[in-house]
Amino acid sequence: GLRDFNVAVRASNGKYWTRRPESGTLV
């Protein structure tokens, strides 16, 4: 979904856990 896409983008920037750790899909 769109959320997963945004998560992927944030993860690539290393700010995934900083923004939304509860969605922990990639990590």
Curated annotation (Swiss-Prot):
Keywords recorded for this protein, A-Z: Nematocyst, Secreted
Protein localization: Secreted; Nematocyst
Cellular-component GO terms for this entry: extracellular region; nematocyst
Comment field (misc): Does not have hemolytic activity, phospholipase A2 activity and acute toxicity in crabs and mice.
Protein name according to UniProt: Cationic protein C1
Lineage: Eukaryota, Metazoa, Cnidaria, Anthozoa, Hexacorallia
